[in-house]
A protein has these predicted regions:
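Catalytic centers of hydrolytic enzymes
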Residues: 39-63, 68-78, 82, 198, ...
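Acidic, metal/ion-coordinating pockets
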Residues: 2-321, 365-376, 388, 423-424, ...
Length: 542
């Protein structure tokens, strides 16, 4: 048997593909080898991840426009399926949250498109729960294909063992076993175990997300018992951007180290383009986000022995060279038009451009605006607060002066985070904000006058008063508003804050209003919005 990971030279590849007459159509050596040798079979696994409701093109993180979207991915997926009918199609999670068109139908359009494209499975992602359990359960019910999350307990039952076959949870499985051209291929799916550090508990009611190592061990045993000739692991998790290692939400290194027999790990969650690399001897690949890349894995097997001979992976950039799939556009056309009209709706005017760059203790003008909108929205609901902790989602975000539309607010606040209030002492507020400043996360405290010393992760609060200069009473509690994501630790960043909020005396409360809607409403009420000099508290201390 040939080494499945031996690097081939360009000359060897061109020679082999040329002999097969497939230079213009076959992307990998495994495909070329199968075309040339009838004693081998190539199975292709086509994959998308982190689509986040994007049907049409968007911009990438470098500002390049006209990239991605499921409509383009579908064009390439169909092309690859024509090239190799021995194909499996999967999505690795975060399917529907992220666009207005998807929010309007609570993800139903995206699941419908997965059904129409005949995906074989999709993996549960963390953003599947941003709109609550009812939306997630409807997505399960609507799916024609299994949904994978081997490391999830549903009311205490492992994936694939939920007793009520009519309940949506019964759709969640540990793996699928597909027989193609005589080869049995198991695809095991896991989700990130980091859910509790992002999501309000009510949004994942009845579900428990475990470290995936032992669930994967059980799934591999079951798959092998079912006759699997090869194991593919796919997970809504990736490698950490800076270190390439694991953390509370990503366990790729642990899984590939524990299960080196896995043929390939198809990743997601971290929004990275990783065409092909070896991780602990396991082929690793990840197809970016928003459909900006679509991925393909080719596994070459010997037909008789059913042994894996070679494995290749690649990702294709979905730019202007790829047309939109007609069926996808036709099916989504009316809802896309409805969304476009809503996004273009005017909400008011901004008198001057507001930028997001800030320093610890020195909130940006954009942060001040968001804080004022949250504070005023809560006041209208008879929930006065003393301050707001919030950020502006990056240093480059800005609101440009002029007429504003709903789309402008979406660009500033892309997530459906709810508003949370809690009662904290001055000491708890100081400890929490010192922790926030140490993380390099863009957050500030609005409604208070905060003085700091040091820069970056070394910034510390040296004094804090109310915005009018009045000193804080250490024996009183102050009502602070923040978003639901930060209230759960902001992705493991604000663990001290989380501990304070979980104490009964904090009276931590989730309010049924989202931060984006608060900012839209602020524009609609004020008509012309001007730069905010300072935010004044709308409450007395508790």
């Amino acid at each position: 048997m040939c080494d499945p990971d031996r690097p081939w030279t360009r000359r060897e590849f061109l020679k082999l593909a040329g002999q097969a007459g497939l230079l213009s159509t076959v992307p990998t050596l495994a495909s070329a080898s199968a075309a040339l040798n009838p004693d081998t079979v190539c199975i292709s696994i086509l994959h998308t991840t982190d689509l986040h409701g994007h049907i049409l093109p968007t911009s990438d993180y470098d500002g390049n426009r006209d990239r991605g979207g499921l409509a383009r991915c579908a064009t390439q997926i169909r092309r690859w399926q024509r090239e190799n009918p021995n194909s499996i199609l999967i999505d690795v999670g975060d399917v529907y949250q992220g666009t207005d068109v998807s929010l309007r139908n609570k993800g139903a359009l995206m699941i419908d498109l997965l059904n129409q494209l005949e995906y074989d499975a999709w993996v549960v992602g963390n953003h599947e729960f941003d709109w609550g359990m009812e939306c997630f359960e409807r997505a399960l019910e609507q799916s024609n294909m299994p949904v994978l999350a081997a490391n999830t307990l549903m009311e205490g039952k492992p994936a694939g063992e939920f007793p009520d076959a009519k309940h949506p949870f019964a759709k969640i499985q540990s793996f699928i076993l597909k027989e193609i051209a005589g080869i049995k291929l198991a695809i095991i799916g896991v989700t990130t175990p980091g859910m509790p550090f992002w999501l309000w508990p009510e949004f994942t009611r009845g579900l428990d997300f475990r470290n995936p190592v032992e669930p994967v061990r059980r799934a591999i045993a079951s798959a092998k018992k079912g006759g699997a000739n090869a194991i593919v692991l796919t997970g809504h998790m990736g490698l950490k951007t800076r270190t390439g290692g694991d953390d509370f939400a990503n366990t790729v290194m642990a899984l590939t180290s524990e299960f080196p027999e896995v043929a390939v790990f198809i990743a997601g969650h971290t929004h990275q383009d990783v065409p092909s690399r070896l991780t602990n001897g396991v082929l690793f690949t990840q197809a970016d986000h928003f459909g900006i890349h679509v991925g393909r894995v080719d596994l070459l097997f010997d037909r008789n022995s059913k042994k894996l001979l070679r494995r290749d992976a690649m990702c294709e950039l979905m730019d202007k060279h790829f047309a939109f799939d007609g069926a996808v556009i036709s099916r989504a056309k009316s809802q896309l038009a409805e969304s476009e009209e809503a996004l273009a709706s005017p909400i008011g005017e901004l008198a001057e451009t507001l930028r997001s760059r800030s320093e610890p203790g020195r909130p940006s003008n954009l942060e001040k605006l968001i804080g004022a909108a949250i504070m005023e929205t809560l006041s209208e609901r008879n929930v006065p607060v003393d301050g707001v902790m919030h950020g502006s989602f990056g240093d480059t975000a800005e609101l440009v002066a002029g007429p504003k539309s709903v789309r402008d607010v979406w660009n500033v606040i892309p997530f459906e985070n709810y508003i949370v209030t809690a009662q904290l002492s001055p000491e708890e507020i100081k400890i929490s904000m010192d922790e926030v400043f140490a993380t390099h996360e863009n957050r500030n405290l609005l409604g208070f006058a905060v003085k700091t010393e040091g820069r970056g992760g070394k910034g510390k609060i040296v004094s804090m008063t109310l915005a009018n200069g009045e000193p804080l009473d250490r024996n009183k509690k102050y009502v602070i508003a923040l978003n639901s994501f930060d209230a759960r630790s902001g992705g493991h960043h604000f663990m001290k804050l989380r501990v304070f909020l979980e104490r009964p005396e904090a009276h931590c409360t989730l309010h049924p209003v989202q931060t984006r809607d608060a900012l839209i409403g602020y524009f609609q009420r004020h008509k012309v919005v001007r730069r905010i000099a300072a935010i004044r508290p709308l409450a007395s201390a508790a």
